[in-house]
Amino acid sequence: MALRDIKPTRSELINLKRKIQLSQRGYKILKMKRDGLIMEFFKILSEAKDSRGELLRRYKHAVEMMAVANTVEGALGVKAAAFSVKETPEITLKSKNIMGVVVPEIESSKVKKTLADRGYGVLGTSPVIDETASSFEDLVEAIIESAEIETTMKRLLDEIEKTKRRVNALEFKVIPELTEARDFIKMRLDEMEREELFRMKKIKARGSS
């Protein structure tokens, strides 16, 4: 806001005071929102660490079980068991609100299956196939949970950065500029008042001489 463009009037002074009040109120609200979002982010971050660890553990276990199944049943036996599964997991994507931020809520069904659901039956396959299938079902569940948490983290982080930029803009640019403009108008009005008073005194002095 260039000071030369400001009209030093009382109405403009009132207008600037109102803008400063609104900006300060907005600054406080945004600061509270930013702090709240940061707290939520660190809660999710703690969950994310656990989720990543569990995902890695289940992934390693599933890979190990696949290696064992390939050794015991052979690649063709494993593929035959995999292709016998008729129902695939169902994913429902919903949303929830965390301090004004819309984040995903993922619901899944038909991930964990019984022997009957898997379709390959007990006869002709070893228990290793069943253990391998179960380990990959566990892995899918971990992936779904991790996807929800990681996406939530990213959206919260994006909103934190956006809110921080707005807080900084108000604190270091908008409010200081408005305050400077207000002080400038007050100074100019005081000067004009003194000039008017001096002029009136001169007129009065002339009239009495």
Swiss-Prot record:
The keyword Signal does not apply. Gene3D superfamilies: 1.10.287.3240. It holds the Pfam family ATP-synt_D. The keyword Ion transport applies. One of its GO terms (cellular component) is plasma membrane. Keywords: ATP synthesis, Cell membrane, Hydrogen ion transport, Ion transport, Membrane, Transport. Signal peptide: none annotated. One of its GO terms (molecular function) is proton-transporting ATPase activity, rotational mechanism. HAMAP family: ATP_synth_D_arch. Has multiple subunits with at least A(3), B(3), C, D, E, F, H, I and proteolipid K(x). Belongs to the V-ATPase D subunit family. This is A-type ATP synthase subunit D.
